[in-house]
């Protein structure tokens, strides 16, 4: 029941925002809609959190402390001067200078909150020259939205919704800007990033970081033990990520600027304990033929081909892993069996004992693409060792010559009409199998299950030409074995005969009616 209520809330919020954007028609280029709406949405979101905190301060300490910044800082809430508060904006919504007031509000918020440096648009609304009446109508629509949602990556989700509407018009790729919450949760639950450096080389709106920190907090961990590093190529998305993290009090190093991870790596010397990523799928011409050929990230491997960046992303991730680092990332299924240079790199990864698990995900998990997707798990140290993790000891067995394959295509529940999501129960089943397989005593806690999971040896993978397609290893039941085809065909024969008889009767009835009307069909 709780999930249904939440879904309805998210849908109504998205629909309201889309309705809001539609009010801009004729005043702003469609490609600008999302930026106009999202900055105002952020302003309302920040204001609502500020007012909530302000009321608590007044109730606890009295009115005279209501405008003391330290009280807001310690609660990870942005301090908003009066001219930056949503109430002030709404009260002045119909004024001729409302665009200037919005720009001033955003500038003042950034000036008063160092964590937002470089995150908010500068003099944006004044430059757009939006019709005052349409801007007032937009503000009124956004004012109706309830931003009180503590469980979802709201800003990222809303941003993704807008991207899905404009992706084709703007020439963007599909799926790389936002990763559905259930997938991020699955990756976090498998990797368990309780303590260390967490990195995302293509962080989008920062959703991976948001859900990872929530995972740590949900398991009584300390988010201060997690250091976050990320990089994002698109400037507007880079700003959004800074907003998304800052508004939740999450400290992060996203580099000096928005930049291409391959050609302008913002974290060249970084070694991460955990890497989570959803790179652009099948990115073409990601480098020139003579570019990056001697890049140190490819050391020990073939140079990834220019035709597809998938293995460029994989090797970038491998190069960033610490001695005991583990990575979970998404790629299109083609990367599992590509030939040529990709095959050579894949063989090297397997021979270097880096591939830990390959998990096929259900279709229709993403809002912007129905492409089939795989979750890869790489582990820099698959040897036997004992690790203390969030106050508990984990005894890992040696898995260097094994790879776990899983197929989740029969999992998932309907979500938002044509989409599906991996439920909490689905994820618990997957993570339980994965963690049991990793640890000592797995003989008692893990077993290969037809159509679900299989632990393959290095020799098996080698015999199959180093393909990582799960269906080459997982046993699938032949559901046709017990079918009596003669009986089945006779049954179908009878049904077809009955349908043909009915068709002839219907045809005769129709001809008779037309004849009686004087419009006979010869």
Q: How would you label these PLM feature ranges?
A:
Residues 16, 23, 32-45, 238, ...:
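Conserved Class I SAM-dependent methyltransferase catalytic core
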Residues 281-303, 310, 343, 348-351, ...:
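Accessory, often C-terminal, charged low-complexity segments
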Residues 128, 148, 202, 230-234, ...:
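Hydrophobic alpha-helical scaffolding
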Residues 284-288, 328-329, 338-342, 358, ...:
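Extended hydrophobic-aromatic, low-complexity segments
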Residues 217, 246, 280, 319-322, ...:
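Hydrophobic alpha-helix feature that most strongly marks membrane-spanning transmembrane helices
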Residues 173-277, 282-292, 297-301, 332-333, ...:
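Conserved S-adenosyl-L-methionine
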Residues 271-272, 308-310, 324-330, 355-356, ...:
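Active-site lining segments that contact anionic ligands and/or coordinate catalytic metals
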Residues 1-194, 253-266, 360-363, 381, ...:
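Non-catalytic, mostly N-terminal accessory regions of nucleic-acid modification and defense proteins
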